[in-house]
Amino acid sequence: MNLQNTLDKLKNCPCGKVHTFDTEVVEIGSGITAKTGEILAAAGFPKKVLIVADNNTLRVSAGLLESLEAAGFDVSKKLIYNDMKYAKIEQVREVEALAADVDGVISVGTGSLNDICRVASFELDKKFCIFATAPSMDGFASDTAPRIVNDFKTSWQARQPMVIIADTKILAKAPIELKSAGFGDMVAKYLGILEWRIANLVIDEYYCPAVAQITLDALEKCCSLADKVTADDEESAGAIMEALVLSGLAMKLAGCSRPASGAEHVVSHYWECYKLARGIWPEFHGKKVGVATLVLVRAYHNIAERMTEVEPTADKTNWDDVYAQFSEKQLPEVIKLNSPTITDKIDPARLKACWGEICRLIKETVPTAEKLEELMLAAGCATKLEDIHVSDELYATGLRYHAYMRYRLLITRIMPMLGADIMDFVE
């Protein structure tokens, strides 16, 4: 990928922000596992490294360690997990303990493996590289990592990888569930960009059309390849990987996660926190996000069709009801995020004046639920609640109360100002 070209296009950006990112090299290609050592050496990546992987990711990356050794890298230090499915603070500390006397960390894998290395590298000020093994989520180029503390999902400040390497031979053979999860994470960008634009309209939140377009171009590329996602197809796997990387870079360029996520991510977080607090595996990130996206796309189109006129008022949230939906461990964070709450910044008269434009944006920039479901099914994505093991009760509470987990303007968060219930629009 030509990263400099991306930055050059954003020079003197009309949004007024100086756009930059820390990632220096992204190499996505067929059979480049054997060239990994050469790529890292050319990039100036330090030679004394810690390799972090699990048994599955190390197995599919045959030849990687040999390539590194041939290029003069010391790979004697390794942390190999049995099967890494979820990132925990204890694992971050394990990486930190072993990385203390090396100069760089190489994560071999995706998702949680990347996250624990991203945080540890940041906290120890070590160089960080990702050798990706599946196009499963959009966080490869992110400078934050998810964390759950007291059953509440927030983000760690972390480190963008200096180098990202992905061999399309490996990506194409990744488990279908992981490839489909990556597609599910990408379609969420429709709502991320929509709600970013709405926040700009209603409360003057910073918005950059050029950065948004980077995400939308990546999204369009992914959608054009929907029917190839589940195939052992290197071209589509590489293109989707590139789109996922661009989505992460867009977050760094914008200085926020708006280009990549909207209400659908927070709904997914609500479901995830509920399950983890009860010791239940919450499913892959992109799998949940895809289902939440489909639900909200249908709801938002119904809102735009049915609520042609609105009379917004000051926020009518029943706070006792909201607080009752969160556990004793979660409550302090919920209270903090809503003191003040985001709707304190919304002028009802301005919301009314903007409503026609909000409805237009929904209708013109977001595909219909029918079209989106068609794309997702072609890509092998989960589309139903039973696919992600979410009960009807958890579904409803997640949709009604997720927005209180963030200080962020979302369509779902302004529903109390409109005297409406999101559940009235899901069908």
How would you label these PLM feature ranges?
Residues N2-C15, I303-E427:
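C-terminal charged capping/lid subdomain of soluble metabolic enzymes
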Residues V52-A53, G109, A166:
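Short beta-strand/turn micro-motifs composed of small residues
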Residues M1-G104:
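ATP/NTP phosphate-donor binding region
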Residues I214-G356, L361-K371:
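Active-site segments that bind and position negatively charged phosphate/pyrophosphate groups
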Residues V18-T20, A43-G44, A97-A100, S121, ...:
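Solvent-exposed alpha-helices and their adjacent loops that cap or buttress functional pockets
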